[in-house]
């Protein structure tokens, strides 16, 4: 971006200066509306989410057999909710900032099959595509026991079709593993940030991995191009897919059920704050949409990004969405949080969700490493760096009197609050890689 343009952008949006300086930044969204007001802009409804629930239920008997690790949950891919009181104390001590309310961790990091939040959206979209093809071919009805998809004739049928996706790692992992299991030929276009072990794991499942020297945007573009030349190839578009988004959104009702089981209340007197790491935006966007449908105006969602990849904060704050990238303002998009190394946000997610998000913040790689170490020490839970992005959120909210005043939160409401940090990945990180992460924390 030329200097004159850059100066006028900074004049209009002074916060951009802090982003360019790679400062850890918090922006509370002044454009937040009620759910009723913001929902029409999403372009999806409660019914769409119910359809996704129903589809995942139809596939549950298949998943329980195809992936024995899901048998105990009856083929439902869901993660545990954990209280992390020792980590809460550690954060308060390290940052000299009390966190009022209770801190919980949503362990999508340990979801079965692919060990990340992408096991929600990625697997869902592959299943939705397989169902569509099988229904159209007359091989399946909605009333069937879907475990029949494991038979050789279905494998044979699906092998005529292929799936392609561009990814920094975790989405590729979930789509690759699922597609290969169903019988699709699958190609994952991996950006320069992708970890070697993720590529190796995909190849071990018979997935074709194409590697790029450039970032996520290039991998997606190349994947899209390659798929266009083959009518039997389906491209899963992380930047624009409504199907992926709906796969994530199912988490809202599921969390509501987990809360009900624990007797945890979410209402005006007991607000819920949720902190979601954000890359291109599909995962956190879909989850936040589902949470809003489940808890209405009593849930407050925040997106967390690396200081080197603040694409969604930049896009929503300036209103330019996918018309601006972090590279345009001189930021390099290089971060240890490989799952969040995205320079240009999803325009679909930004425009759909900008009224339903309470805020955005950035944190440095070092902060993620520090918290990664503390969580391992205090709670014995090991995550990858990206998954710690949400952990900085509770301090930011508890430290901002102006945010609390705008929303009219009393001290008592904050004492009764639940702070939920969405841990997005790390359950499958190899031991030696994890030890390298742990060594970087202070």
UniProtKB/Swiss-Prot annotation:
Pfam family membership, one: PALP
Highest taxon of the lineage: Bacteria
Keywords: Lyase, Pyridoxal phosphate
Matching InterPro entries: D_Ser_am_lyase (IPR011780), Ser/Thr_Dehydratase (IPR050147), Ser/Thr_deHydtase_PyrdxlP-BS (IPR000634), TrpB-like_PALP (IPR001926), TrpB-like_PALP_sf (IPR036052)
Listed GO biological process terms: D-serine catabolic process; isoleucine biosynthetic process
SUPFAM superfamilies for this protein: Tryptophan synthase beta subunit-like PLP-dependent enzymes
Record field: catalytic activity: D-serine = pyruvate + NH4(+)
N6-(pyridoxal phosphate)lysine modified-residue sites: 118
Named cofactor requirement(s): pyridoxal 5'-phosphate
EC number: 4.3.1.18
GO molecular function, one term: hydro-lyase activity
PANTHER family registered for this protein in UniProt: D-SERINE DEHYDRATASE, THREONINE DEHYDRATASE, MITOCHONDRIAL-RELATED
Sequence similarity: Belongs to the serine/threonine dehydratase family. DsdA subfamily.
Subunit note: Monomer.
Protein known as: D-serine dehydratase
Organism: Escherichia fergusonii (strain ATCC 35469 / DSM 13698 / CCUG 18766 / IAM 14443 / JCM 21226 / LMG 7866 / NBRC 102419 / NCTC 12128 / CDC 0568-73)
Gene name as annotated: dsdA
């Amino acid at each position: 971006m030329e200097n004159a343009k850059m100066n006028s952008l900074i004049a209009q949006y002074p916060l951009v200066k802090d982003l360019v300086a790679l400062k850890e930044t918090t922006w509370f969204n002044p454009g937040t509306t009620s759910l009723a007001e913001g929902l029409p802009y999403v372009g999806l409804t409660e019914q769409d989410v119910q359809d996704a629930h129903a589809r995942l239920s139809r596939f549950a008997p298949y998943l329980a057999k195809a992936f024995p690790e899901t048998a105990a949950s009856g083929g439902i891919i869901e993660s545990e909710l954990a209280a992390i009181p020792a980590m809460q104390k550690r954060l308060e001590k390290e940052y000299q900032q009390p966190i009022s309310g209770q801190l919980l961790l949503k362990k999508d990091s340990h979801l079965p099959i692919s060990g990340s939040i992408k096991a929600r959206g990625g697997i869902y979209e592959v299943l939705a595509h397989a169902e569509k093809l099988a229904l159209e071919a007359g091989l399946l009805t909605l009333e069937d026991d879907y475990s029949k998809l494991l038979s050789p004739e279905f494998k044979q049928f699906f092998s005529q079709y292929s799936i392609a996706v561009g990814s920094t790692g975790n989405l590729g992992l979930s789509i690759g593993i699922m597609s290969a299991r169903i019988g699709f030929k699958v190609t994952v276009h991996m950006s320069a940030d992708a970890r070697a072990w993720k590529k190796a794991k995909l190849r071990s499942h018979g997935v074709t991995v194409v590697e790029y020297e450039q970032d996520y945007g290039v991998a997606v573009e190349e994947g899209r191009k390659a798929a266009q030349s083959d009518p039997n190839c389906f491209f899963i578009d992380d930047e624009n897919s409504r199907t992926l988004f709906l796969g994530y959104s199912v988490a809202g009702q599921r969390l509501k059920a987990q809360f009900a089981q624990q007797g945890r209340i979410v209402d005006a007197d007991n607000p819920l704050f949720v902190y979601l790491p954000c890359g291109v935006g599909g995962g956190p966007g879909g989850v936040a949409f589902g949470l809003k449908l489940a808890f209405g105006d009593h849930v407050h969602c925040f997106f967390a990004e690396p200081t080197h990849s603040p694409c969604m904060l930049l896009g929503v704050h300036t209103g330019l969405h996918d018309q601006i990238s972090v590279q345009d303002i001189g930021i390099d998009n290089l971060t240890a949080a490989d799952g969040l190394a995205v320079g240009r946000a999803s325009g679909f997610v930004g425009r759909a969700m900008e009224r339903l998000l309470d805020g955005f913040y950035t944190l440095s790689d070092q902060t993620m490493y520090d918290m990664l170490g503390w969580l391992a020490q205090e709670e014995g839970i090991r995550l990858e760096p990206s998954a710690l992005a949400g952990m900085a959120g509770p301090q930011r909210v508890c430290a901002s009197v102006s945010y609390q005043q705008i929303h009219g939160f009393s001290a008592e409401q904050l004492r009764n609050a639940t702070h939920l940090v969405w841990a997005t990945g790390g359950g499958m990180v190899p031991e030696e890689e994890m030890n390298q992460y742990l060594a970087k924390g202070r």
